[in-house]
Amino acid sequence: MKSRVRKSKYTVHRKITSTPFDGFPKIVKIIVTDPCATDSSSDEENDNKSVAPRVKRYVDEIRFCDEDDEPKPARKAKKKSPAAAAENGGDLVKSVVKYRGVRQRPWGKFAAEIRDPSSRTRLWLGTFATAEEAAIGYDRAAIRIKGHNAQTNFLTPPPSPTTEVLPETPVIDLETVSGCDSARESQISLCSPTSVLRFSHNDETEYRTEPTEEQNPFFLPDLFRSGDYFWDSEITPDPLFLDEFHQSLLPNINNNNTVCDKDTNLSDSFPLGVIGDFSSWDVDEFFQDHLLDK
């Protein structure tokens, strides 16, 4: 008869614990074997099925070592400050501040370039020793191309220009017109007496010249005719003074028969005795106000 060989599954669980110790290093192991170990509680329910038995072995290992031999936890690397990075030449490339339109070359120089929106191309501005010089070169090019809309690093763009609305100056057309045209314009009547807008009807209005009837002129009578006497007129003067001296005192000047010589003295023919002496005349009586005397 052949003997049946029973197979079993053997597993080892090891746990290591390290503790500090002043003396020599020592190791303590605790081993436990479980021949009837099961993976889960469901294995006990399936009794009808033939399942290979499991054997588990638990090993606990305790190590006693010195404090110097104890492994230290890994420390986190601290980031260097920009000041410390500036002291070290190797870290200078990594701590450079980035500016708009500036790039650093592998050999350490700084290049500046800008994009031209009109041509849609990049303009090369040159290579500079420092990043600040390259940034200033970019700012100048941006202000020259974009004006007040430029985005700069250091330089301040110019202010936007203010749009001033200038008042429109009226256009005055001066035309020289003849006397006939000005007379015609004066005859044009306005539609409204209060209207301030003048307009011309030269294209639509026809001018007609109509004869005007002249009124009968009024002729004044010839008061001073070349007649027999100098004062002869249709209006009879007041006979108080003129009739008395007309015929007797005044000579007939306009008479053709009378010839006056240069040596003729008219004062001889004019009797002054009729008037009297001038010193005897009371002139003040003529200028007195009779109303005040009353």
Curated annotation (Swiss-Prot):
Pfam families: AP2. GO terms for molecular function: DNA-binding transcription factor activity; transcription cis-regulatory region binding. Coiled coil: none annotated. Induction: By cytokinins. GO terms for cellular component: cytoplasm; nucleus. It comes from the Eukaryota. It is found in: Cytoplasm; Nucleus. GO terms for biological process: cotyledon development; cytokinin-activated signaling pathway; ethylene-activated signaling pathway; leaf development. Residues 98-155 bind DNA. Keywords: Activator, Cytokinin signaling pathway, Cytoplasm, DNA-binding, Ethylene signaling pathway, Nucleus, Transcription, Transcription regulation. SMART domains: AP2. Residues 35-54, 64-87 are annotated as: Disordered. Component of the cytokinin signaling pathway involved in cotyledons, leaves, and embryos development. Probably acts as a transcriptional activator. Binds to the GCC-box pathogenesis-related promoter element. May be involved in the regulation of gene expression by stress factors and by components of stress signal transduction pathways. Belongs to the AP2/ERF transcription factor family. ERF subfamily. This is Ethylene-responsive transcription factor CRF5. It comes from Arabidopsis thaliana (Mouse-ear cress). The gene is CRF5.
